[in-house]
């Protein structure tokens, strides 16, 4: 009887260790990534300022974790700021916000970005708290920052890509896409340049 009791205790301890390790790996990884994002953003912003003072004709080639970036997105209300990687795939989405579709950052058209909806609030994990009228700042590689105002928030099926279309021709728009409802839907947040 004592052997069975000891075996049950040992199994429970191992299970507890595995669960704790999984939590630490999941959230610890996000925490470390956030620290790296913060330190890299400082370097990226310094490089953008340096390029601006040098009046270079070509855009700087800046990278984050080995991936080229197109700019920086900042949403003050939910306290997020990330470099935008220039393409979307499984690997880049683990690292930062990514370009999904559209022109270069701050150009005419619908610049569409995607990011994970992390439960710890990182990446686009807090976009559910955004409302119509909230602001998004987008800085491109020319160090030009444009402020956008949210005008539409809605949910779509994962296969629906109609959100990449511009709502109004000749305007600058940004669309944020993230998963929601247990990955069954996508939360779409659309914003237009404030003129």
Please describe what each predicted stretch is.
Residues 2, 6-195:
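Solvent-exposed, non-transmembrane regions of membrane-associated and secreted proteins
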């Amino acid at each position: 009887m004592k052997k069975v009791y000891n075996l049950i205790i040992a199994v429970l301890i191992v299970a507890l260790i595995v669960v704790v390790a999984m939590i630490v790996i999941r959230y610890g990884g996000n925490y470390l990534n956030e620290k790296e994002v913060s330190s890299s953003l400082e370097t990226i912003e310094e490089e953008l300022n340096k390029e601006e003072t040098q009046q270079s004709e070509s855009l700087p080639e800046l990278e984050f974790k080995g991936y080229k970036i197109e700019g920086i997105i900042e949403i003050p209300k939910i306290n997020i700021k990330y470099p935008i990687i220039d393409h979307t795939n499984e690997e880049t989405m683990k690292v930062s916000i990514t370009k999904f579709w559209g022109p270069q950052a701050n150009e005419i058209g619908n610049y569409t970005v995607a990011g994970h909806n992390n439960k710890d609030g990182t990446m686009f994990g807090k976009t559910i708290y955004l409302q119509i009228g909230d602001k998004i700042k987008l800085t491109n590689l020319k160090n030009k920052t444009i402020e956008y105002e949210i005008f539409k928030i809605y949910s779509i099926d994962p296969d629906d890509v109609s959100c990449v279309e511009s709502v109004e021709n000749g305007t600058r728009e940004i669309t944020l896409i993230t998963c929601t409802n247990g990955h069954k839907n996508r939360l779409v947040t659309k914003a237009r340049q404030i003129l």
